[in-house]
Amino acid sequence: MSNVTHQPKIGFVSLGCPKNLVDSERILTELRTEGYDVVPRYDDADMVIVNTCGFIDSAVQESLEAIGEALNENGKVIVTGCLGAKEDQIREVHPKVLEITGPHSYEQVLQHVHHYVPKPKHNPFLSLVPEQGVKLTPRHYAYLKISEGCNHRCTFCIIPSMRGDLVSRPIGDVLSEAKRLVDAGVKEILVISQDTSAYGVDVKHRTGFHNGEPVKTSMASLCEQLSKLGVWTRLHYVYPYPHVDDVIPLMAEGKILPYLDIPLQHASPRILKLMKRPGSVDRQLARIKQWRDICPELTLRSTFIVGFPGETEEDFQMLLDFLKEARLDRVGCFKYSPVEGAGANELPDQVPEEVKEERWNRFMQLQQQISAERLQEKVGREILVIVDEVDEEGAIGRSMADAPEIDGAVYLNGETNVKPGDIVRVKVENADEYDLWGSRV
């Protein structure tokens, strides 16, 4: 009679941003390596881990609801992630949670799991883990986290209080991980962090090593090295430092994708000062023009906040004027929402909700028109598209201008002779304010 040992099962809920997703992947990789099974149902699991988000109040609410659901359905719950930094807030609502840890507390999470659900006898056949680790994204793209934390103290944000100051990963480790991802079939690497352009600042851009070669710990050096892997490299969360200018030529040369996700947040110098953000709109417009002169194919994505405390109609009009002038390709807009612990909560002249709503609508109406015009310029042109999914009706993919989850899509109706991860040439036939339609060339 065979000696079959029980393989302990862990349920896992991952909430929030791609940076949190990477943390979840790391925890899951460790659990699978140790022989735990990861299951999709609460009632099958010996325990549930909830990786939370605590960035804005709606995210806090979603996290608390997910914890409650896991407690109701399973009963044994460990909480980690950003909201875990506010243990009292979680305990007040859910006193029966077993353990709570903050973000990137991987070792603590594993220790707690070992305590409540002891490690299984290691069976290498049950716990085979791919070299690139457990990934929660489709096989053809992956997030590459290059640092943790942030040195900025924007008044609307509490990330530094949750994730701490900037800590850059050694550049050799980052490049080795990127190589493993590419060897595993990844076709697109999405570089993420709290502040990608600050990479290496905390270590004074010291020289690291990869494959025995010296490499400077900086965003530009990282991009130069990633370009050698022969896959799409996309930059996210790029704070508008002057040295961002250094990566634009790499985009123009086709070494990394001509795509910049650069959160500008506002255009009124007064509001930017209240936010503790850099505040020269004229300089930013001049830089955008310069970037486009160097790299005409550049796609610019940004995010903005309307209804920030103290925002007047004049401030808001400056923001609309900036949009008209900058003609950004992809834009997200948030109505200011107070976050517990954020400095902006103490500012006078809070904007009424109905005014926030009205300004958000005006903002989106203008930007949708600009985005539609920018996409219309692509009709008739040929572009490269990476395929994300295929069904009997055709394929859906993304151009170099589209990041997963947050940007638009390219629809290839009737094109079934492709598979996810394929990069194909497409002639654009139609466009709206978000998406493109086309046929394979």
Swiss-Prot record:
Residues 376-441 form the TRAM domain. The lineage of its organism: Bacteria, Pseudomonadati, Pseudomonadota, Gammaproteobacteria, Enterobacterales. The keyword Plastid does not apply. It catalyses: L-aspartate(89)-[ribosomal protein uS12]-hydrogen + (sulfur carrier)-SH + AH2 + 2 S-adenosyl-L-methionine = 3-methylsulfanyl-L-aspartate(89)-[ribosomal protein uS12]-hydrogen + (sulfur carrier)-H + 5'-deoxyadenosine + L-methionine + A + S-adenosyl-L-homocysteine + 2 H(+). Binds 2 [4Fe-4S] clusters. One cluster is coordinated with 3 cysteines and an exchangeable S-adenosyl-L-methionine. Its EC number is 2.8.4.4. It comes from Salmonella arizonae (strain ATCC BAA-731 / CDC346-86 / RSK2980). Residues 8-118 form the MTTase N-terminal domain. SUPFAM superfamilies: Radical SAM enzymes. Keywords: 4Fe-4S, Cytoplasm, Iron, Iron-sulfur, Metal-binding, S-adenosyl-L-methionine, Transferase. GO terms for biological process: tRNA modification. Residues 136-373 form the Radical SAM core domain. It is an enzyme of class 2 (transferase). The gene is rimO. Catalyzes the methylthiolation of an aspartic acid residue of ribosomal protein uS12. [4Fe-4S] cluster 1 binds at residues 17, 53, 82. InterPro entries: Elp3/MiaA/NifB-like_rSAM (IPR006638), Methylthiotransferase (IPR005839), Methylthiotransferase_CS (IPR020612), Methylthiotransferase_N (IPR013848), Methylthiotransferase_N_sf (IPR038135), NA-bd_OB-fold (IPR012340), Ribosomal_uS12_MeSTrfase_RimO (IPR005840), rSAM (IPR007197). One of its GO terms (cellular component) is cytosol. Gene3D superfamilies: Methylthiotransferase, N-terminal domain, Nucleic acid-binding proteins, tm_1862 like domain. Its cofactor is [4Fe-4S] cluster. This is Ribosomal protein uS12 methylthiotransferase RimO. One of its GO terms (molecular function) is metal ion binding. [4Fe-4S] cluster 2 binds at residues 150, 154, 157.
